[in-house]
Amino acid sequence: MKWWKAMYGDTLPSNTEGGSLRRMHGAARVMFTHRDGQSRLAELDQRTPMRVLFPKVPAGTPPVAAVTTVSGGLVGGDTQDIEVSVGDRAAATAIGQAAEKVYRSNGPDSNVEIALNVGEGAWLEWLPQETILFDGARLNRRTVATISPGGRLLAGECLVFGRLASGETMAHGKVRDAWEVRDPTGRLNWADTLL
């Protein structure tokens, strides 16, 4: 057993039998449009603990949005709503600033809803960093990509079950990671779920 678990294990925030925790509901919404021959930020809405950062990119390069959370990770009952949209003929990349962490839950799931919207002739890259699942984590994540004719999406997610280099494994918990690809009318073109 790690020394810190022996010393502080019973006082960690996820050990709350009989107590209640304040749950977070973070949100980030970003939209890019094509104007004057360039892709530009058109709308931005963010609710704590979610933030969207915009690293400087070389001229002529599509903009980059780094979606991050300042809370350090998700615990049971937390929710995140993320929406990234690129309008017709626009292009953008959305990344994660760092790995997302999902900590042990005392019961409820951590819920993440992601909407990726790609306009006609548009290009979106959705390339967040990995999601690290700690022992006892409970994650319910749903990603819905709505792609217009001629639109293209490059997307990927990576799940890491524990941190082996730190001697941590995910022996139990819950993961539900669902993906859907739809057209603008809402018609389902493809779906897959990892349980």
What are these regions (language model features)?
Residues 2-111, 120, 170-195:
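Terminal catalytic/cofactor-binding subdomain
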Residues 131-133, 138-140, 153, 157-195:
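Short acidic-hydrophobic catalytic motif
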Residues 97-99, 129, 158:
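An acidic- and aromatic-residue-enriched active-site/binding cleft used to recognize and process polar
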Residues 12, 115-144:
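Well-ordered alpha/beta subsegment
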Residues 83-85, 93-95, 115-117, 125, ...:
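Extracellular beta-strand solenoid repeats
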Residues 67-68, 74-75, 80, 132-133, ...:
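Long, contiguous hydrophobic alpha-helical segments, chiefly transmembrane helices and signal peptides
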